[in-house]
């Protein structure tokens, strides 16, 4: 019974830590300066003129990309892989926080089962 209480408490702590780190990331993103606030606004306007004619859309999973902003979905990242000595960046779905929590629970349960034997 005590072991179950310890496991549940540790799971709650892990979930709390994971949610607080996401809140810190959101806070940091809110504090970043916008384009209008930067000193190099003229450079950004030139970039907009050049790329203004391009129609932008998101890139699907497992297609090549340059940065995270191009990939479709909230938990999709532009991750680099090395193939034959060349770096290839592909959009990959990382699954988000829920997938990580479920994976942690699965590992915990398997460790408990192995301890009982």
UniProtKB/Swiss-Prot annotation:
Residues 20-55 are annotated as: Disordered. The keyword Disulfide bond applies. The keyword Signal applies. Expressed by the venom gland. Residues 21-56 form a propeptide. Residues 23-55 have a biased composition (Basic and acidic residues). The presence of a 'disulfide through disulfide knot' structurally defines this protein as a knottin. This is Hainantoxin-XV-4. The lineage of its organism: Eukaryota, Metazoa, Ecdysozoa, Arthropoda, Chelicerata.
